Amino acid sequence: MSGKKRTASSNRWMLEHFDDHYVKLAQKRGLRSRAAFKLEELQQKDQLIRPGMTVVDLGAAPGGWSQVAVKLAGDKGKVIACDILPMDPIVGVDFLQGDFREEKVLEALLTRVGADKVDVVLSDMAPNMSGSDGVDQPRAMYLVELALDMCHQVLAPNGSFAVKVFQGEGFDEYMKAVKEAFKVVKTRKPDSSRARSREVYLVATGYKL
């Protein structure tokens, strides 16, 4: 019994230490959140963003992903970000505050995108968690479905999509829908993602619709 207690305690300590490592590293590098490391890991494996690209970042606040994206896209690139929460300005990022689920906010976002198609759609969106899977999972799936809808509206042929998805009810159906829209779809679990989290990232390339 005592051995099991020590193991559980050790696991909790390791998780907290692991989290602290990324939080401290983010602070040291001037990154706004530990989530920035997730996009960096996806970029290292899948080379999603290249100089000169146009990127849409959904669920952007506090700005960790936008910081990474604007650096990768460079001076000739463009990053358009949206979140229901406020976000301090980032040089090179066009930020729209509003609820992405509302039609008027979606229209405003599409206006900022303009007539030209975008190269990459990013979504790190997640609902406010209630602790009830029966409530949280449908909310989370609704958000990722909206992100895929955004791809259908703005993504250029052969464009890319990276989206956070929580494994659970609706995941398999969503994976099927993403595979129908893209040539290649990979499931990633970044090292910087909390081990206890059900979140994974779908990285889809070669938009074909």
UniProtKB/Swiss-Prot annotation:
Annotated catalysed reactions: uridine(2552) in 23S rRNA + S-adenosyl-L-methionine = 2'-O-methyluridine(2552) in 23S rRNA + S-adenosyl-L-homocysteine + H(+)
Keyword Nucleotide-binding: no
Keyword list, A-Z: Cytoplasm, Methyltransferase, rRNA processing, S-adenosyl-L-methionine, Transferase
Pfam families (alphabetical): FtsJ (PF01728)
Catalytic residues of the enzyme: 164 (proton acceptor)
Gene Ontology annotations for the cellular component aspect, listed alphabetically: cytoplasm
Binding sites annotated in the UniProt record for S-adenosyl-L-methionine: 63, 65, 83, 99, 124
Keyword Kinase: no
Protein localization: Cytoplasm
Lineage: superkingdom: Bacteria
EC number: 2.1.1.166
MF term (GO), any: rRNA (uridine-2'-O-)-methyltransferase activity
The protein's role, per its UniProt record: Specifically methylates the uridine in position 2552 of 23S rRNA at the 2'-O position of the ribose in the fully assembled 50S ribosomal subunit.
Protein family (similarity comment): Belongs to the class I-like SAM-binding methyltransferase superfamily. RNA methyltransferase RlmE family.
Protein name in the entry: Ribosomal RNA large subunit methyltransferase E
Source organism per UniProt: Shewanella sp. (strain MR-7)
Name of the gene: rlmE
